[in-house]
């Protein structure tokens, strides 16, 4: 299997932030990496306040109850990547930004390569995870929630999805980001989604199809513990040398523009 052609990556750890800012930072890193200004980057971050991120192709009006989100104090933001809705709260989120020329291959291949870093990370935490090869067929079909079925090469434990990820490409650069959840909060998630079936039943189904670190480890890990495992897992599995560094001034300026003009605006979040 082909590993990344560039071994020297930047590790960026940013504090919890609103959803619009988080998505803006990921895009700013993509733009700056495309220009050759910054190296391939592994970013680790959190969300404050909690947020629901919507897949790029989802309909906000059809799938998310915005008023329920407001009552819960939960932001809503559309991701630049596909997939379904995710509740971001008790978790660590990762993003990887790397030029396609430095990680050649189609989406499935690159997804598998990056999943090896995630697999090594959760195994460092003592979790006996595996890569899902063929998605299982579950009764009832998928819902608007991201974690209801594992996709190919996503992490699962005992047949239950643990880490959900999504990938997009632009300007010759791969952006993949995903969630390592401490607590699924299935009931809370379905309170904020527009669904036709019984919310309690959907939450129970999700808990049968997905899991979280709290259940796998028998305790809730610290954010720092999981961040350390992710950095070590990616470095070890992909043969990387990670150098901790902050976002550049240019990335910060561009992220502020994108958060204000794009990810924080109705024209982006309500576009479908």
Summary of predicted features, one role per range:
Residues 47-60, 93, 97-98, 113-120:
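Extended cationic-aromatic binding surfaces that line active-site or macromolecule-binding grooves
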Residues 100-236, 266, 272:
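Catalytic beta-strand/loop module used to bind and position nucleotide/cofactor moieties
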Residues 57, 84-85, 166:
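Gly/Ser/Thr-rich beta-alpha loop segments that engage phosphate groups in nucleotides
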Residues 1-63, 67, 71, 75-79, ...:
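Active-site loop/lid in soluble adenylation, ligation, and acyl-transfer enzymes
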Residues 45-46, 86-87, 156, 181:
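Well-ordered beta-strand positions
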Residues 63-104:
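A glycine-rich, hydrophobic loop/mini-helix early in the fold
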Residues 47-49, 71, 87-91, 150, ...:
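Short connector loops at helix/strand junctions that flank enzyme active sites
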Residues 33, 90, 161:
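Active-site-proximal flexible loops/turns
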């Amino acid at each position: 299997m082909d590993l990344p052609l560039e071994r020297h990556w930047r590790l960026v750890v940013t504090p919890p932030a609103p959803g619009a800012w988080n998505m803006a930072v990921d895009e700013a890193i993509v733009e700056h990496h495309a220009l050759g200004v910054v190296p391939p980057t592994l970013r680790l971050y959190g969300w404050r306040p909690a947020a629901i991120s919507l897949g790029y192709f989802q309909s906000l009006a059809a799938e998310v109850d915005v008023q329920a989100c407001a009552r819960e104090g939960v932001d809503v933001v559309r991701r630049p990547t596909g997939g379904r809705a995710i509740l971001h709260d008790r978790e660590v989120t990762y993003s990887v930004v790397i030029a396609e020329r430095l990680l050649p291959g189609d989406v499935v291949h690159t997804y598998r390569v990056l999943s090896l870093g995630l697999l090594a990370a959760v195994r460092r935490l003592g979790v006996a995870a595996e890569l899902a090869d063929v998605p299982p067929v579950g009764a009832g079909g998928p819902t608007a929630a991201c974690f209801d079925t594992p996709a190919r090469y996503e992490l699962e434990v005992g047949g239950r999805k643990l880490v959900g990820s999504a990938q997009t490409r632009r300007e010759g650069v791969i952006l993949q980001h995903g969630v390592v959840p401490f607590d699924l909060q299935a009931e809370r998630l379905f309170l904020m989604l527009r669904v036709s079936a019984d919310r309690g039943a959907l939450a129970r189904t999700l808990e049968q199809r997905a899991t979280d670190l709290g259940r796998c480890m028998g305790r809730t890990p610290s954010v720092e513990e999981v961040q350390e495992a992710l950095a070590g897992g990616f470095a070890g599995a992909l043969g990387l040398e990670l150098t901790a560094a902050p976002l550049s001034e240019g990335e910060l300026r561009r992220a502020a523009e994108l958060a204000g003009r794009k990810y924080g605006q109705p024209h982006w979040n309500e576009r479908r």
